[in-house]
């Protein structure tokens, strides 16, 4: 009977970090690929920003030109190539410049989130006011400075025009009345403009 041989488990080889001529570890290919993807995503986020929000981004001139050109192009393939170019320009930024852009984008997303929530509140309130007279009593209790007579008139007219199939003039005016009663400021309106791309332009 031949002697039993002991199986040796082969340990996986750990990847060794590459070193440059000065002895410092260089990023792995996977790390570089991941960083390039993150910058590409950041560039896409800039291209997708509303026009007014884009003006507030701390971008070097070269990046600003590349982003604006990407926004201008409508051809799918041309836009894809331009977005790749935006990514290459992004890779030329310093760490501080990239960090400043991320901070500004995070702040803009916060503004958009708050503005969107506010628009949804106005829309829900309008639906409630049109559905029930009790909703107006509750609204006036929470917003005592609102013009009661104007609110009642707008609600009555909005209901009537809906029944008659007329254009929603008073429906839109009721939106503005609720927004004003809720204490909308100039900054609220600016935020709503940035967040309202998917809302009725007449209501923003």
Curated annotation (Swiss-Prot):
Segments for region (Disordered): 1-31, 182-204
GO MF terms, alphabetically ordered: ribosome binding; rRNA binding
UniProt record, GO biological process: assembly of large subunit precursor of preribosome
Keywords, in A-Z order: Cytoplasm, Ribosome biogenesis, RNA-binding, rRNA-binding
Transmembrane segments: none
Record CDD domains: YjgA-like
Superkingdom, taxonomy of origin: Bacteria
Gene: darP
Annotated compartments: Cytoplasm
Protein name: Dual-action ribosomal maturation protein DarP
UniProt family annotation: Belongs to the DarP family.
Positions with biased composition (Acidic residues): 186-204
Function as written in the Swiss-Prot or TrEMBL entry: Member of a network of 50S ribosomal subunit biogenesis factors which assembles along the 30S-50S interface, preventing incorrect 23S rRNA structures from forming. Promotes peptidyl transferase center (PTC) maturation.
Lineage: Bacteria, Pseudomonadati, Pseudomonadota, Betaproteobacteria, Burkholderiales
InterPro entries linked to this entry: DarP, DarP_sf
GO cellular component, as recorded: cytosol
Chief location bin: cytoplasm
Xref: NCBIfam families: PRK05255.1-1
């Amino acid at each position: 009977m031949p002697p039993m041989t002991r199986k040796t488990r082969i340990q996986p080889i750990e990847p060794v970090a590459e070193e440059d001529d000065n002895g410092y570890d260089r990023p792995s290919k996977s790390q570089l690929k991941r960083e390039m993807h993150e910058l590409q995503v950041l560039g896409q986020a800039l291209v997708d920003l509303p026009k007014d929000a884009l003006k507030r981004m701390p971008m070097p001139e070269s990046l600003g030109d590349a982003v604006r050109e990407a926004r201008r192009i409508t051809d799918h393939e041309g836009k894809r190539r331009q977005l790749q170019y935006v990514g290459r320009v992004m890779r030329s930024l310093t760490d501080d410049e990239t960090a400043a852009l991320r901070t500004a984008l995070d702040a803009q997303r916060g503004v958009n989130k708050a503005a969107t929530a506010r628009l949804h509140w106005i829309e829900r309130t309008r639906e409630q006011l049109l559905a029930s007279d009790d909703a107006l009593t509750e609204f006036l209790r929470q917003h005592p400075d609102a013009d009661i007579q104007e609110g009642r008139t707008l609600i009555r007219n909005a209901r009537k025009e809906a029944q008659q199939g007329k254009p929603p003039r008073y429906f839109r005016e009721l939106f503005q009345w609720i927004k004003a009663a809720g204490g909308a400021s100039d900054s609220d309106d600016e935020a709503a403009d940035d967040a309202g791309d998917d809302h009725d332009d007449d209501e923003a």
